[in-house]
């Protein structure tokens, strides 16, 4: 057997260099893969961060459309059932159906006061508020246009009462909106409740808010009626005013919703005095949208929502302390 010749220094150096090149060749693809993975991770992180910090969502058009349609339907139901005893239940049931139908898309606010309340609770981005409000008021206006067309242009609205302000009406709208928003915030906080259960809870919250406001309206109107009767007897009532009687007497119920208030109307003199079903010829239909309704519902919604946050926070703090 032939013996192996010892390797020369030159051969040894050549072999070492070859091994080094091979190791570098293997290391380069590995390093390249690591760098590419890091770049992909950075890009993904940046994309997610941009999506999270984006002011407007990608489905903004869907939100606007669903809010418009939802407010349109709610307004029609509120107007058609406004003079029925069970109107709060009909309106609450309608809201329940709307939450089930469009809640997953826009949250089914269909009420500028709810949008403002959620914004005050930091549950809604500021940039979205104008879009919600625009869609909601457009929905209510669409209901007015439809009713005007169907009634042969007799359902025209007058906004001469927009600047009117009654502390009594302000109070009932504020309390009703606060009760409604308190219940809504409580329902939304219950993560274990199914969507159908939340829809029922939100609808019932609106029903209870309307019932509470309606209960408060009765003493307000009684006080206004007594004051008006005393004014008639003493001759201090101005018969040439826009309303011959106190403003509170022309209101048939609370709205708790500025968009619905835009389409809702006050009673006319003939309806109030003679119990007529429709306004007399030449009488104006005064819109319920006024400073008292707008300010009361917005403030009430903010108070109700944030009051629940306060109560819920204190409750959790006490549980942790115990």
Where are these regions (language model features)?
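Membrane-interface helix-loop junctions and terminal tails of multi-pass membrane proteins
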Residues: 2-322
